[in-house]
């Protein structure tokens, strides 16, 4: 257990520190108008449009809208998708949206508030409430499109956005089905640590650190960047500062660390992704400590939930725990020989057929 905790802590620290350095259609523009920075294989038969819309806080959300062939001839089912936490729509969420479009769904991948190309005066911060609201704002947008059936809209959350997708489905009854992949409950993760390893004493130390950081930010009139999950050394000292990580993967790196590194630093690198080029604001965890994303998990029913996790994923327990807590209808799918990051972009491991079947059956 200790090895797993230290491994995940190393990953999170790494992700926060490397290279610190007139209607809705009128808001659309062709994806080709600007340089295409998507990091996955692009299908020429699937049209993508750059779109913008506002959430109820007035924050402008940027999205990539993927359109199935012959979409104008009918009212289509639709899906909103976002994640992983700190990633951008040109990475995993865009891959998912494009693939779901091949199954006949209008699919919208979006950057949450304060990240990517979306608005928000403070950059690189997050809120469980606002990120959840972004899902509902995406539903608003889709439901006003002439070619979308507003009664057939679903949601997908990847990694850390899974909790927001489920929470949105618990309140927004317009979301008729919700699926998660490699789920993380960010409220639980930030306030309790991986596998809930924080002791009461450690939790107190983190609260003191976050409180003191607020004084520093107030005095400097800036928002310092830092690790969103502080960790503790062998002497139980809180280690909150960013750790310098070599550009090259260390030879002794374990498989979990290597999987994250190879995705964010190598094959799916994107300059706007928080998970590699910069960091979250240091005080960002405060709102996740204050508000639990899973507080209304039982309210999701009767909206169907599909939880997908790899059998080797360090995050698997999140999906299993939510499956136990959620009411029917619900389904848990464990993908054989798959780790956490495999479900970001491994086309041989992501069960798109299952996702298509799930949404086809429940978006009727």
Residue ranges of predicted features:
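Short beta-strand/loop motif that positions the catalytic acidic residue
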Residues: 300, 307-309
């Amino acid at each position: 257990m200790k090895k797993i905790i230290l491994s995940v802590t190393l990953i999170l620290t790494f992700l926060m520190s490397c290279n610190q350095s007139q209607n809705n259609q009128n808001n659309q523009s062709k994806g080709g108008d600007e340089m295409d920075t998507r990091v996955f294989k692009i299908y020429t038969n699937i049209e993508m449009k750059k779109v913008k819309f506002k959430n109820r806080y007035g924050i402008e959300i940027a999205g990539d809208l993927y359109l199935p062939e012959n979409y104008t001839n009918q009212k289509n089912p639709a899906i909103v998708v976002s994640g992983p936490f700190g990633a951008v729509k040109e990475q995993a969420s865009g891959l998912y949206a494009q693939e779901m479009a091949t199954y006949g769904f209008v699919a919208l991948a979006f950057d949450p508030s304060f990240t990517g190309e979306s608005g928000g005066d403070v950059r690189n911060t997050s809120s469980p409430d606002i990120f959840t609201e972004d899902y509902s704002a995406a539903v608003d947008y889709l439901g006003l499109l002439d070619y979308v059936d507003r009664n057939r809209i679903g949601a997908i959350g990847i990694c850390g956005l899974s909790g927001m997708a489920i929470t949105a489905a618990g309140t927004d009854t317009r979301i008729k089905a919700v699926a998660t992949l490699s789920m993380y409950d960010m409220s639980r993760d930030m306030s309790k640590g991986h596998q809930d390893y924080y002791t009461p004493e450690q939790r107190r130390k983190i609260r003191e650190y976050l409180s003191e950081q607020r004084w520093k930010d107030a005095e400097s009139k800036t928002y310092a960047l830092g690790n969103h999950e502080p960790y503790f050394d062998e002497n139980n000292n809180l280690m909150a500062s960013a750790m310098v990580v070599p550009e090259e993967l260390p030879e002794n790196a374990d498989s979990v660390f290597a999987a994250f590194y190879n995705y964010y630093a190598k094959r799916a690198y994107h300059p706007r992704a928080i998970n590699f080029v910069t960091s979250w604001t240091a005080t960002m965890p405060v709102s996740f400590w204050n508000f639990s994303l899973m507080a209304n998990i039982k309210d999701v029913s009767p909206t169907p939930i599909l939880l997908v996790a790899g059998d080797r994923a360090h995050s698997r327990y999140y999906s299993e725990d939510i499956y136990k807590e959620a009411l029917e209808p619900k389904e848990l799918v464990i993908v054989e020989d798959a780790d956490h990051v495999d479900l970001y972009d491994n086309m041989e491991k992501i069960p798109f057929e299952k996702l298509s079947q799930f949404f086809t059956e429940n978006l009727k």
